């Protein structure tokens, strides 16, 4: 290598151009002269200091709007001036009964929280295989189903690729697509919230999108994708991600086993609703072997925590509790639906999930209704999207939560 000779930065050094490659005789030293800036050191330093951090951010993220999450108890408590136990939280579709008692016991008896978790979540996947009837080699666990949605996109989508979204639906699909630099083709649902299969087929043929996200039951309306519709979409040359976060409440069998015969199907599940583990973030998915291999390569190695795996395994050991809670929530859903039909300014939609979507009518403002109920300590979901303007969503709670909601609603009629 040559020796670089630097000149004083306040002057300009002029040198002859030298060949980029040459031989150097033994005991000879090559003198390389370079151009130096005539800008004073202090001024150049100030210019460098003016570079802001956002200069390093990927351009497509600079205008990304953050995901709008539901506020947790501690934040709501401060804002409303109420104790957490005095807030009726019907805005996030959480399981009000919480996990089986075995979960709390297992977490208290956890022996090795200081050891990294199993990267393959083998114990959990074995338990899920027994629970679902699908072999563990088709199953991958994640830090909530949300992590798996992002992982799928990172493995499937190049910047500029397209996905199909069918609003109104879970907004995480559109958000993660934006994070990954993909474009979203929206195929709105029919007025009854069913899928527009003909339009989906046209989009797949002409736009060649990589994947489509379907939720069954769909969030926020609680409608389901029947087998005939799903098979029609699976016949298209597109990867179908079926989100079954709420399938337990639908009375339908999960499609997890279908991944063995459909190479273009992924099925996602979660412990948040069924087992009351939303706060511990543990989800899972069923994948064709031709796809799951690459997700294993790309996923974070320690994505499912020791606590999450312990809790999920403990929950699966008490299927009777899980079944009883499901039955209780389905029964309360039907009672809540009938009560909401009696409210003169609400038009509820039948639901296969643990929530009910209502159209706000009779001149009542949906956003103000949500805000007024919040001041009374009852939280429901309101939407800003054009597809759901004038709608609210109510999660199914315990019977006493329903009573509190109905008591507050009576203030308006």
UniProtKB/Swiss-Prot annotation:
Any one GO molecular function term: pyridoxal phosphate binding
Residues with the N6-(pyridoxal phosphate)lysine modification: 273
Transit peptide residues according to the UniProt entry: 1-35
A UniProt-annotated Pfam family: Aminotran_1_2
GO biological process: L-histidine biosynthetic process
Chief location: plastid
CDD domains named in the record: AAT_like
Protein keywords: Amino-acid biosynthesis, Aminotransferase, Chloroplast, Histidine biosynthesis, Plastid, Pyridoxal phosphate, Transferase, Transit peptide
Cofactor requirement: pyridoxal 5'-phosphate
Tissue specificity as recorded in UniProt: Mainly expressed in green tissues.
EC number(s) given by UniProt: 2.6.1.9
Location in the cell: Plastid, Chloroplast
Family, per entry: Belongs to the class-II pyridoxal-phosphate-dependent aminotransferase family. Histidinol-phosphate aminotransferase subfamily.
Name listed for the protein in its UniProt record: Histidinol-phosphate aminotransferase, chloroplastic
Organism: Nicotiana tabacum (Common tobacco)
Encoding gene per record: HPA
């Amino acid at each position: 290598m040559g020796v670089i000779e630097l000149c004083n930065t306040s002057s300009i050094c002029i040198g002859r151009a030298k060949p980029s490659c040459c031989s150097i005789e033994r005991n000879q030293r090559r003198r390389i002269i370079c151009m130096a800036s005539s800008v004073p050191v202090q001024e150049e330093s100030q210019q460098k200091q003016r570079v802001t951090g956002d200069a390093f951010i990927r351009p497509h993220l600079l205008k990304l709007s953050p995901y709008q999450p539901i506020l947790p108890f501690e934040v709501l408590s401060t804002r409303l001036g109420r104790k957490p136990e005095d807030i009726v939280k019907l805005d996030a579709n959480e399981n009000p009964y919480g996990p089986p008692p075995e979960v709390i016991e297992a977490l208290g008896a956890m022996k090795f929280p200081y050891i990294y978790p199993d990267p393959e979540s083998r114990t959990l996947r074995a338990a899920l295989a027994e629970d679902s009837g699908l072999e563990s080699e088709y199953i991958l666990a994640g830090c909530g189903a949300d992590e798996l949605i992002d992982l799928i996109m990172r493995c499937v989508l190049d910047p500029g690729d397209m996905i199909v979204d069918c609003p109104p639906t879970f907004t995480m699909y559109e958000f993660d697509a934006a994070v990954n630099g993909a474009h979203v083709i929206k195929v709105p649902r029919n007025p009854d919230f069913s899928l527009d299969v003909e339009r989906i087929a046209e989009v797949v043929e002409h736009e060649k999108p990589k994947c489509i996200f379907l939720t069954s039951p769909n969030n926020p309306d609680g409608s389901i994708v029947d087998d005939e519709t799903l098979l029609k979409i699976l016949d298209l040359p597109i990867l179908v991600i079926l989100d079954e976060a709420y399938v337990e409440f639908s009375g339908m069998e999960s499609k997890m086993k279908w991944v063995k015969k459909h190479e273009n199907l992924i099925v996602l599940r979660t412990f948040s609703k069924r087992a009351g583990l939303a706060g511990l973030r543990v989800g899972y998915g069923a994948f064709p072997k031709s796809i799951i291999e690459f997700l294993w390569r790309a996923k974070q190695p320690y994505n499912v925590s020791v606590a999450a795996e312990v809790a999920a395994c403990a929950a699966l050991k008490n299927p009777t509790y899980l079944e009883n809670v499901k039955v209780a929530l389905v029964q309360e859903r039907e009672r809540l639906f009938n009560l909401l039909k009696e409210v003169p300014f609400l038009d509820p939609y039948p639901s296969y999930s643990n929530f009910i979507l209502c159209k706000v009518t009779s001149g009542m403002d949906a956003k103000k209704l949500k805000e007024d109920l919040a001041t009374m300590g009852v939280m429901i979901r309101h939407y800003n999207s054009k597809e759901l303007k004038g709608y609210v969503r109510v999660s199914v709670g315990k019977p006493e939560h329903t009573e509190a909601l109905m008591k507050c609603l009576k203030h308006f009629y």
